[in-house]
Each structure stands twice: as C-alpha cells, then as structure tokens.
Amino acid sequence: MLVIILGVIGLLASSNLVSSSTSTRVGGHLPLTFDPPENELGYWCTYVESCRFCWDCEDGVCTSRIWGNNSTSIVENSYIKYCEVSRWGDQCRYDVEEHIYYTMNCSDPKPWNPYKIARKEWKKNEHFRKDLKKDEF
C-alpha cells in the first residue's frame, strides 16, 4: 500500500515538473548545437545577442537574423562569437567560443552580454579594406 501511495506521489510530482518546464518559451531538450532551430532564434538571440547564429554577415557588415533590416547593422568584429546552446529541462546554457559558460533558467531568462563593449554600429558610408602588408601594394 505504501509503495502505491509513493508511486502516485512520484507520478504527480513528475507531471508537475514536466508541465512547468514545458510552459517556457522553449520546451523539451535541445542537444548542444551551433545551429538552434529557426523558431527558437528569437529566444536564444534575445539573451545573448553576440552569438554568430544571430547575425547574417557579408563583407564585414552584419544584420540581425531576428530583427532584419529594421535593426542597426553592426561591424563584424570580436563582438560576434561562436556559441553553442543547449537545453535540458528548465536549464538553458550558452557555451561561448572561449569556453565561457552561461546558464540560466529557461522560464526566467536574464540577458548576458559581456562583449557589448566590442559592438560597433556600421555607418552607411563606412568602407572596409583589408590591411595591406608592405609588399602587397
């Protein structure tokens, strides 16, 4: 009888955990990836916006994959980082290229951007050129 009661309590507890973790904007498990699902980009890029998968870069100018042409374009520099993301239950984790880890509760996300100082907005008349070595003139 005690085993049955404990089993029922365990079942109720686990169903409560499942419903609370799936009520987040992203749900289920996501194995470590450099390329999160397209429908989750808005979530992942809102909280760590310097991840490379958040940006489309061409000729040194990057545009947000989430906000597109309605956002400010930025210069491709050390602000843009390779990130891997994963999710296990209610734990969302970023692994940034220098093996810096940021973990947050998926249901209570907090923005994190230590690279913001490197962000440089692109100005329309700004041109990029490769730094030439002396013998490349």
Curated annotation (Swiss-Prot):
Keyword Signal included in the entry's annotation: yes
- A Pfam family hit: v110
Q: Which residues are glycosylated?
A: N69, N70, N105
- Taxonomic superkingdom: Viruses
Which first-to-last residue range defines the signal peptide? 1-20
Under the heading InterPro entries, the entry gives:
ASFV_fam_110 (IPR004848)
Keywords, alphabetical: Glycoprotein, Signal
Described function: Plays a role in virus cell tropism, and may be required for efficient virus replication in macrophages.
Family label: Belongs to the asfivirus MGF 110 family.
Protein known as: Protein MGF 110-7L
The root-end lineage is: Viruses, Varidnaviria, Bamfordvirae, Nucleocytoviricota, Pokkesviricetes
